[in-house]
């Protein structure tokens, strides 16, 4: 199963790491949002 993100201006096409994320650090290794 491929993982994808919700459609929207603030979401990426697919999850990727966001090491600078301040909140939801559980998802910092695979995030749909930009940190």
UniProtKB/Swiss-Prot annotation:
Keyword field: Disulfide bond, Transport
Positions of disulphide bridges: 5-32
Function of the molecule: Required for the transport of riboflavin to the developing oocyte.
Family: Belongs to the folate receptor family.
Protein name: Riboflavin-binding protein
Organism: Struthio camelus
């Amino acid at each position: 199963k491929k993982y994808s993100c919700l459609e929207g201006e603030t979401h990426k096409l697919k999850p990727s790491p966001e090491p600078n994320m301040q909140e939801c650090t559980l998802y910092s290794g695979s995030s749909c949002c930009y940190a």
